[in-house]
Amino acid sequence: MKLTQFAPSKILVAMMLVAAPLAWVTLRAQQQAPALSALDYVEIGQLANRYAHAIDTCSNNGYDYADLYTADGTFTDYVTDEGYAKKGLVRARGREELARAAGGGTLGCKNVGWNGWSHLMLNHVIPPAPGGARGRVYLVTIGSKGPNSVERFGGYEDFYVKTAQGWRIQSRTHVRNKAWHNPLLQSPDLN
């Protein structure tokens, strides 16, 4: 059988049958999140540790806290009654607002509402995601209801990106206990 006996439409169909699966595999690979290295996990985990120290101490007038975020980073409230009712309320965006959110910046660390508290970040889960990584971590506070009190105070849901300065928080949402997205993980609202 000569090649000239095949109709051009049959050749085109055969080529499409070969090309379509290859295109699908390529597209699927592009949509999946890249793997994170062990160093990525350590550096992202350090953000949670540095966050707790920066917020507890208002170090560097709140700018140590702000510098854990990207330049356009956001902190969203989904823990207060107002934030919960609005399904999230951006409380701070960008370095200056984030420094003030930590009690610093123009506020000068004078009346930090959580003075005497210790923020503990526990059970940090960091799955890779397109463009960076997601994070989910419980927040437990010591001292929020008086000396030696211990309370789960919801948690944080984050999106991290790798910048020239290393991993940074692009967005952090403080979520109250009953608002965690998996109903099996929801606990009575203590906030």
Spans of model-derived segments:
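Short beta-strand segments enriched in hydrophobic/aromatic residues
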Residues: 55, 69-70, 77, 139-141, ...
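A beta-strand edge to alpha-helix "cap/lid" segment located at domain peripheries
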Residues: 30-35, 109-191
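Short, low-complexity N-terminal intrinsically disordered segments enriched in polar/charged residues
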Residues: 27-67, 71
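Bacterial N-terminal signal peptides
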Residues: 13-23
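Bacterial N-terminal signal peptides that target proteins for export
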Residues: 2-15
